[in-house]
């Protein structure tokens, strides 16, 4: 058996002495399929799983994904290192003082580091779409910190159609669905509205990873549009993405929403990559 691609397509090669109808082959086939769908080792640390059937990440790894509780920029949510906090003016980072983002406020659950980063990579590049439900719970914690009304519209940062076809899904959409599902079920946010196609990306762009701050802004400038402006007029919009680095993509989305008449745009991400914390990498 070979597992091909992030969608885990299974290709079986039968040995010459095996018959597909033999009990031994069927037993091995079932076992192989079960191991592929329900791994026996944690996806992140490799330790043997001892939880209920179908678990994929061990309890210790989930527990290690803690929220950021330190000081951060009041506008964009950039985490401050202890030496940096005293230099902040009016609780704003240098970037927000020089060039205010288009969104009203941005918050992230945690730093893009450690097991949170690994879980996002498993979701994004290895087809572990089922992780979005649990990660949506983490997003819900960040959402509740915003103290927003439950009548907001939740929308994902869109992928271009070609990128979505290549990947098979939009990870931001999966996370946004997980967030709304959790808030409705556990927090009784019945008025929260999820709209998957609120925004569209009008052209393909280069990946943001590796680009400078100015190049990131230029790369996504004018890329997003609102399909039906009447849906956002005078509404509060919560934008969801997996990782926020400079905020260029979320700011470009917010600009399109504000042009369409949105009264308030909040940016919510699962993790924040920050140069002040080298281990957090880039999104």
Annotated model-derived regions:
Residues 1-283:
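Glycine-rich phosphate/pyrophosphate-handling loop used in enzymes and phosphotransfer proteins
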């Amino acid at each position: 058996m070979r597992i091909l691609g992030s969608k885990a397509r299974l290709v079986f090669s039968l040995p010459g002495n095996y018959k597909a109808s033999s009990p031994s082959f069927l037993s091995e086939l079932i076992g192989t399929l079960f191991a592929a769908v329900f791994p026996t080792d944690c996806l992140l640390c490799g330790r043997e799983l001892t939880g209920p059937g179908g678990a994929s990440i061990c309890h210790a790894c989930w527990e290690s994904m803690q929220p950021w509780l330190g000081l951060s920029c009041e506008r964009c949510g950039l985490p401050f290192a202890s030496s940096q906090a005293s230099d902040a003016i009016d609780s704003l980072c240098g970037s927000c003082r020089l060039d205010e983002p288009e969104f009203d406020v941005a918050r992230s659950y945690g730093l893009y580091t450690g097991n949170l980063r690994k879980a996002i990579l498993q979701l994004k590049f290895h087809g572990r779409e089922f992780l979005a439900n649990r990660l949506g719970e983490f997003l819900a914690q960040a959402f509740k910190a915003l103290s927003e009304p439950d009548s907001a519209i939740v929308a994902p940062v869109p992928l271009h159609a070609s990128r979505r076809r290549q990947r098979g899904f939009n990870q931001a959409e999966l996370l946004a669905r997980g967030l709304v599902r959790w808030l409705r079920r556990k927090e009784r946010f019945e008025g929260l509205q999820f709209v998957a196609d609120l925004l569209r990306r009008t052209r393909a762009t280069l990946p943001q990873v590796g680009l400078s701050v100015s190049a990131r802004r230029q790369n996504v400038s004018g890329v997003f549009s609102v399909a039906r402006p009447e849906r956002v007029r005078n509404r509060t919009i919560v934008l969801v993405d997996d990782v926020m680095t400079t905020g260029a993509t979320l700011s470009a989305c917010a600009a399109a929403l504000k042009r369409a008449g949105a009264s308030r745009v909040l940016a919510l991400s699962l993790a924040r990559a920050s140069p002040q914390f080298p281990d957090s990498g880039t999104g």
